């Protein structure tokens, strides 16, 4: 049996795709990898350019994506298996066998479509919002809201950022006042991914005093009176459905409160570990997409009487991208192994990984930035054109910045990683 899988372009695939000496992956991982790649290449990749031009992914595509098990895979199959009913996971992996490395494979292989907008449309809201519902929702809430998501009949988004509040979550101003059996919500959430087509928004709202101790999380239906949405025209990710959502005296049943009242800030902080690991996986696969396209271009493009690939300068650029991808992915795999060994549920925090998740996201985003820049340098005008061999690199050059900023900016996460790691090391030192 051959262990080789995928591209022969150097550094275009994770090392375990071509090397059998790897203890982290087994036959179910290889089966999943093959299943996801076949699906993405046949049903998603050929249509990304059209969907980005249209500014949306067709609803029947999103529903089929969920029906094939990808919504459940993004949330945490072992935690939602009782809500899956007839839905089977990609690669036919049993929910009880699903681990963190299966999740990494899905995040990696779906991103190979080469369009961040399409990638986000297929499941960003599910990936970042639904783990909160799984980890903090009541059994009644999970039974009501999870089955439609898993079957592709409804979609979620996460509303945190506001027009005047970005990284400073503790000072958000969207307010929810309790009146009897309802919360009355007023305020605006901005840059909400999937906000144009989501059915529900898990929103951070102020229910108490100023600061982090006065924030709660509400699951707000988006088809009720007082909710208005406006699509935000961004540099990239056109099909991702980025929106501004305004709440004007919106009535939300008190039973839609997730977790404890005024504990929402801490719930959000715990959810970011999974969120940032997912972003890191996306960044590194998209960096590989750039590398692969630049390498293939360099094989055929002639300059000064020989192919680009025969110029040492070009090979050095490709090597630099490969160095960053390989080292960053090794960090991501180590973090994934740590999460697995600690039996961390997706979306929950565990002592010792918050700072590592932050710095892994920073490293992956920097790698993606480098890959975009150097691939454009190699491909020249072809990678500045929305048609031809450089169209994916051109598109990703517009998509890339949102992954550097979103999910925590490089500056915020770098500073946080030092502070958090110092706390964790001091805690570890005092452990028996």
From Swiss-Prot:
This is Acyl-CoA dehydrogenase AFT10-1. PANTHER family: ACYL-COA DEHYDROGENASE (AFU_ORTHOLOGUE AFUA_2G16630)-RELATED, MEDIUM-CHAIN SPECIFIC ACYL-COA DEHYDROGENASE, MITOCHONDRIAL-RELATED. Gene clusters encoding host-selective toxins (HSTs) are localized on conditionally dispensable chromosomes (CDCs), also called supernumerary chromosomes, where they are present in multiple copies. The CDCs are not essential for saprophytic growth but controls host-selective pathogenicity. Pathway: Mycotoxin biosynthesis. Belongs to the acyl-CoA dehydrogenase family. Keywords: FAD, Flavoprotein, Oxidoreductase, Virulence. One of its GO terms (molecular function) is flavin adenine dinucleotide binding. Disruption phenotype: Reduces the production of AF-toxin and pathogenicity. SUPFAM superfamilies: Acyl-CoA dehydrogenase C-terminal domain-like, Acyl-CoA dehydrogenase NM domain-like. Its cofactor is FAD. Its EC number is 1.-.-.-. Signal peptide: none annotated. It holds the Pfam family Acyl-CoA_dh_M. The keyword Oxidoreductase applies. It comes from Alternaria alternata (Alternaria rot fungus). Acyl-CoA dehydrogenase; part of the gene clusters that mediate the biosynthesis of the host-selective toxins (HSTs) AF-toxins responsible for Alternaria black spot of strawberry disease by the strawberry pathotype. AF-toxin I and III are valine derivatives of 2,3-dyhydroxy-isovaleric acid and 2-hydroxy-isovaleric acid respectively, while AF II is an isoleucine derivative of 2-hydroxy-valeric acid. These derivatives are bound to a 9,10-epoxy-8-hydroxy-9-methyl-decatrienoic acid (EDA) moiety. GO terms for cellular component: cytoplasm. It is an enzyme of class 1 (oxidoreductase). GO terms for biological process: fatty acid beta-oxidation using acyl-CoA dehydrogenase.
